[in-house]
From Swiss-Prot:
Localization (cell): Cell outer membrane
Keyword set, alphabetical order: Cell outer membrane, Membrane, Signal
Lineage: Bacteria, Pseudomonadati, Pseudomonadota, Gammaproteobacteria, Pseudomonadales
InterPro entries: LipoPS_assembly_LptD (IPR020889), LptD (IPR050218), LptD_C (IPR007543), OstA-like_N (IPR005653)
Record note on quaternary structure: Component of the lipopolysaccharide transport and assembly complex. Interacts with LptE and LptA.
Name used for this protein in its record: LPS-assembly protein LptD
Recorded GO CC terms: cell outer membrane; transporter complex
Region (Disordered): 60-100
Family: Belongs to the LptD family.
Pfam families found in the cross-reference section: LptD, LptD_N
GO annotation (BP), single: Gram-negative-bacterium-type cell outer membrane assembly
UniProt key word Oxidoreductase: no
Length: 927
């Protein structure tokens, strides 16, 4: 029962539950049973009790007699001595536990709501880490979700026995005392409630619960009207966050903030002191989800290993301003490194993070980012600055000791049709990402940094895009790329379809421009060499405008058993070119001419068709739907001389099964490949009743009726056997899923003319859905048909590709040919211990590209990885890419304290993520 009168509760918010009192024995003459007295509130607010009538009293049952415990006149609980006369040991102090839970309170730590793993429900197991032997489970109790403010909430009280002294205005309760007000509940063996002072004193097995927090102690003082409390010799638990600790005493403020004196903080299990934070003053704020501590030592097995005067840490997954876990590293080109991030929770929809990075060999790098999220957009600004004290590159061209980076990433919509996008990164020098790490989210480390902004309008049947895109070189081993400044595209489909005809159109107007670098490059030793841009010659040096129009008409015909789509496309391209004097003179020397205005018109005719057959079948006792899907594609494109057109954004696609059914073997619009071919492909699938595709096999080949004479600049079809062949290589693709955990993918392209493999790959991947911590990858790749631009010669190369030309000082045969195997594994060998390994080997150059091996230890509250790694490091001191490759090795240690974050070894996470397929999924699903 509860007292609802605000006037009375303000005086003394307490009503002893009569039904409980009537059932329990009372010890002394001062103890009264509620059933034998009529009690009411007097005018002064005190108790007014009178004995019931004799008649009523006769009907009462006899009073029971205490046999073991009673409430004394001074409010203490007395117990009979044991027959052996042994003294009961006094309570153990939390300081004696050395970071563990107090076993003297319960051997199984049930006093901390600890539930062993075998007793958890399926839902609780799903929220429990794989290596945790249990979890903190808050028991269901009345009022636990009550949101009533403490000052407005009535108090409920229960106990086995009670006594009230009217003169002192003190109520004494004994035996399983429970006080509940709002969401807070306090339990103890005995309690003395002082009406005049509105406070309570509790002794023996004190437990205070509120908002997912539990505080356990030997005794406590409680302010009855506000909920403020002090618990001595305290242990605490935050259930949802798996956080626990202890303190000399814990104070609960009126706003539910918990303050600990000489307290500890850890996410380890009650029987573990693997790591703890110990501080003079620790504050835990459930309202914000963060805690603070002063004069803090990080202790491992109760041994101090690190000191900080102040720390700010999360106690759940909410955002809050403050320091994030630091990162410590040593070695490399930067020496000892310390990163101490500070997070600014500016608003629910935007925040910022500052990353001060101290590097012993370079100085202080200040880096920061600002993130925003609005109803129609999201994005991130970032920047970094360093006055570099390292002078290893002081002789190199393009180096600047004032290092900086700026970036902006944005995606947004002005409304449902207008879209905006920005992807912009700029750096001080091309060596920035080779020398310096970045902590910003979304910054991509590539050789060509994107500097792009676009505005898109999406109509009902068309889209229009205004795009401006430039590139910043983050390397000296490549030539300057073309910028698109600006680019306009309009693509769509006409909204009417007479007789089933479909009218499509693609239009583009774009300006290609670049400033080629001239002069010489100076390497680390002060040696001079010609810039790579000087290798670009003739028409390849041109800038220009390009207008491309590509309307088409098709007649799609679809049936349940197949499809047929004849299509006619017409491509018209107009160029307005400009060429510098060097390019003109080189063109004239080779017997060529330059025309600033060039156009090209090419019709394209194709017929795409396919059939669909299926049947129900059974394979090894399993029912499947087996399909057979033949496809026939005919393409005719007449030859058009395009040698007077530069290749602004064009290259040749590598051969694959999907390339059999394209209408242009080139990417971009500067080359339209002449074709007269018939492609045949067949796909076979095995599909389970639930839609799961167990197996897929596809094979195809093209028959050519004419040579392919249109080539990239400087490439002659007469020198290419594949351009004169009557048939294409056989293209095969195969995928088999043993189940949802095992997957095998492969592709294979075999040339019947040369009777050799053009390219191929096979990849085996294993990662169980139920056990994502198990990963096995094995793959093999071979490719000798690449078509690429060679920066060292300024020419397009067909085949595997050498670096340079025979006789050049930096010549490397088959540098770009790929023939590699890649094996990686993460596998539990015993509980909590996993093996980590990768080996990537280049058969072509007979060298290991990367190899590492080590182990991981993972338990409920911390994780450690120790990895020995060898890799080919790439650090540019020369324009010749092979000269910048050098073998390196190191031993890497990563330690993660769960609940605090990584203490050291962030680079381990980086190369594991890059080198082992499935690693990121493993970490995302781990606890």
């Amino acid at each position: 029962m509860a007292l609802k009168s605000p006037a009375f509760r303000k005086k003394f918010p307490l009503l002893v539950t009569g039904s409980l009192l009537a059932m329990q024995p009372l010890a002394t003459q001062f103890v009264v049973a509620a059933e034998q007295y009529d009690c009411s509130v007097s005018a002064s607010g005190a108790w007014n009790c009178a004995p019931k009538s004799t008649a009523a009293a006769v009907e009462l049952p006899p009073r029971p007699v205490h046999s073991t415990a009673s409430v004394s006149s001074n409010g203490t609980v007395t117990s009979e001595s044991s027959s052996s006369g042994e003294q009961v040991a006094g309570p153990q102090l939390v300081t004696e536990a050395k970071g563990k839970g107090l076993k003297s309170r319960s051997a199984d730590y049930s006093h901390l709501d600890w539930v062993p793993r075998e007793k958890l429900t399926a839902a609780q197991l799903a929220e429990t880490g794989p290596y945790c032997s249990g979890a903190y489970v808050e028991p269901i109790r009345p009022g636990m979700d009550d949101k009533t403010p403490m000052k407005d909430a009535p108090m409920f009280v229960g106990a086995k026995a009670s006594r009230y002294e009217q003169e002192a205005q003190v109520a004494t309760l004994a035996g399983d005392v429970v006080l509940r007000q709002g969401s807070m509940q306090v339990q103890a063996q005995e309690a003395a409630l002082h009406q005049a002072e509105n406070r309570g004193e509790l002794n023996g097995d004190v437990r205070l619960r509120d908002n997912g927090a539990l505080i356990v102690g030997d005794k406590a003082e409680l302010q009855l009207d506000t909920g403020e409390a002090r618990v001595d010799n305290a242990e605490y638990v935050l259930h949802k966050s798996n956080i626990r600790g202890n303190a000399l005493y814990a104070k609960r403020a009126e706003n539910a903030i918990i303050r600990l004196k000489d307290g500890t903080y850890t996410t380890c299990e009650p029987n573990s002191n693997a790591w703890t934070l110990k501080g003079n003053n620790i504050t835990l704020n459930p309202a914000t989800g963060f805690g603070t501590a002063t004069n803090v030592t990080l202790r491992v097995k109760d041994i101090p290993v690190l000191y900080t005067p102040y720390i700010y840490f999360p106690i759940d997954d909410r955002r809050q301003s403050g320091f994030l876990p630091p990162t410590i590293a040593a070695g490399g080109d930067n020496g000892f490194t310390l990163v101490t991030p500070y997070y600014f929770n500016l608003a629910p929809n935007y925040d910022a993070t500052l990353y001060p990075r101290y590097m012993a060999d370079r100085g202080l790098l200040m880096e920061g980012e600002f993130r925003y999220l609005t109803k129609g957009s999201e994005g991130q600004f970032g920047g970094a600055y360093l006055n570099d004290e390292n002078d290893d590159r002081k002789l190199q061209s393009d180096y600047d000791k004032t290092r900086w980076m700026i970036n902006w990433h944005h995606k947004g919509g002005l409304d449902t049709r207008w879209l905006t996008q920005v992807d912009y990164t700029d750096i001080s020098d091309p060596y920035y990402f080779q020398d310096l790490e970045t902590d910003q989210i979304g910054v991509k480390r590539t050789d060509f940094l994107n500097q792009q902004g676009s505005l898109t309008y999406r109509g009902d049947s068309y889209s229009a895009v205004f795009n401006a895109q430039a590139y910043k070189l983050a390397t000296v081993a490549n030539v300057t790329p073309y910028n698109r400044l600006p680019q306009l595209t309009l693509n769509g489909t006409l909204p009417y379809n007479p007789e089933g005809l479909k009218f499509d159109y693609q239009t583009e107007a774009v300006r290609f421009d670049r400033d080629l670098r001239t002069g010489t490059f100076v390497d680390e030793n002060g040696n001079f060499e010609s810039r790579l841009d000087n290798n670009i010659s003739g028409l390849d040096r041109a800038n220009g405008d390009r207008l491309n129009l590509a309307p088409s008409v098709s007649l799609p015909m679809n049936w349940s058993y197949g499809f047929l789509t004849p299509k006619v496309k017409y491509v018209y391209t107009q160029y307005d070119l400009s060429l510098d004097g060097t390019g003109k003179s080189q063109l004239a020397a080779s017997g060529g001419t330059f025309d600033s205005s060039v156009n090209r018109s090419v019709p394209i005719f194709s017929v795409d068709s396919g059939l669909y057959f299926d049947r129900n079948t059974n394979w090894f006792g399993k029912d499947y739907r087996q399909t057979l899907e033949p496809r026939l594609f005919y393409l005719y494109v007449p030859e058009k001389d395009q040698t007077d057109i530069p290749a602004f954004d064009t290259s040749e696609s590598t051969f694959s099964y999907s390339s059999l059914f394209r209408d242009n073997r080139f990417t971009g619009s500067d080359r339209i490949g002449d074709e007269n071919k018939l492609s045949l492909g067949i796909t076979n699938r095995w599909i389970e009743d639930n839609g799961f595709e167990r197996q897929r096999f596809a094979i195809g080949q093209a028959i050519y009726f004419s040579d392919r004479k249109v080539q990239l600049p400087g490439v002659s079809f007469a020198d290419r056997d594949d351009a004169k062949a009557n048939v294409s290589p056989y293209a095969l693709e195969y995928e088999y899923r043993f189940n949802r955990d095992w997957r095998f993918n492969s592709d294979f392209n075999w040339d019947p003319d040369s009777k050799s493999t053009r390219s191929g790959s096979a990849m085996f991947h294993y990662q169980p859905e139920a056990e994502p911590n198990k990963i096995v990858n094995f793959g093999y790749r071979y490719r000798n048909d690449q078509i690429r631009y060679d920066e060292s010669t300024g020419r397009w190369i067909v085949g595997g590709g050498d670096y340079g030309r025979p006789g050049d000082p930096n010549y490397v045969k088959d540098y770009y040919k790929i023939q590699q195997h890649d094996f990686s594994v993460i596998w539990p060998i015993v509980p909590q211990w996993s093996l980590i390994s990768r080996w990537q080997y280049d058969y072509n150059r007979e060298r290991t590209i990367e190899a590492f091996g080590g182990f991981e230890y993972d338990n409920c509250c911390w994780k450690m990885r120790l990895v020995n790694r060898y890799w080919i490091d790439y650090d540019e001191f020369s324009q010749a890419a092979p000269q910048n490759e050098k073998g390196d090795r190191g031993i890497f240690l990563q330690i993660v304290l769960k609940g605090l974050g990584g203490v050291t070894g962030a680079k381990v996470d980086s190369f594991l993520d890059k080198g082992i397929q499935g690693y990121r999924e493993r970490e995302d699903q781990a606890f």
